[in-house]
């Protein structure tokens, strides 16, 4: 994942909000509202890594952009299916297959511009994204879409890795953003930090 001034600015935008409100627990995934439904999970398209990790061997395996996105998709999908099995999650690999079969009617799930949903100012889906998601959900007779909008890694003051996520659920028909959460967690490795951040919004006692 490239570390440039642009990445640094994205990190600042993504991480500032959770850091400002750590006393408030992140909003949990609304599992009870989604139970029994087919819910597509869009691929993540933005992973920002603090430039401070440039020479850190801990991040050596996360420097290839596509591989890092695939890893993040896998971790998110695993957490959703293991911790919220009552929802019929339609994960990125299947979404891509469905989109390929409906080429010309459905946009590529990796190129819908979903990272823009990390902005807390958005209350409605932008028109083009709304149209893309409406077409996508029609393939599975769904309505609600789960969007991992962005993932950021930074160095915690105690030296651990800090993972911060921007997660959104939206109604593809009405265009309304129904839920937003900004979980954050620390861990000895990027994988451990991300796993803990996901667990924060997927508590087992919901």
Where in this protein do the model-derived segments appear?
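N-terminal segment of the mature soluble domain
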Residues: 54-142, 146
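Positively charged n-region of N-terminal signal peptides that target proteins for export
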Residues: 1-4
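Generic secondary-structure transition motif, activating predominantly at the C-termini of alpha-helices
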Residues: 18, 80, 84, 103, ...
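C-terminal/domain-edge helix-coil "capping" segments
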Residues: 22-53, 72, 112, 124-143, ...
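Bacterial N-terminal signal peptides
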Residues: 8-20
């Amino acid at each position: 994942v490239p570390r440039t001034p642009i990445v640094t600015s994205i990190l600042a935008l993504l991480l500032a909000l959770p850091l400002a409100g750590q006393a408030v627990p992140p909003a949990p995934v609304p599992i009870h509202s989604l139970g029994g439904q087919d819910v597509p999970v869009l691929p993540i398209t933005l992973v920002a890594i603090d430039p401070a990790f440039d020479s850190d061997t801990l991040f050596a395996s996360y420097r290839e952009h596509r591989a890092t996105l695939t890893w993040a998709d896998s971790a998110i999908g695993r957490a959703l299916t293991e911790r919220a099995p009552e929802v019929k999650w339609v994960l990125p690999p299947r979404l891509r297959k469905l989109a390929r079969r409906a080429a010309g009617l459905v946009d590529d799930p990796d190129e819908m511009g979903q990272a823009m949903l990390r902005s807390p100012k958005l209350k409605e889906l932008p028109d083009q994204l709304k149209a893309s998601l409406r077409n996508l959900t029609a393939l599975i007779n769904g309505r609600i879409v789960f969007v991992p909008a962005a993932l950021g890694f930074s160095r915690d003051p105690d030296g651990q890795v800090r993972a911060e996520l921007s997660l959104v659920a939206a109604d593809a028909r009405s265009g309304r953003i129904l839920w937003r959460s900004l979980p954050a967690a620390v861990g000895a490795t990027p994988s451990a930090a991300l796993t803990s951040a996901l667990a924060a919004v997927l508590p087992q006692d919901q």
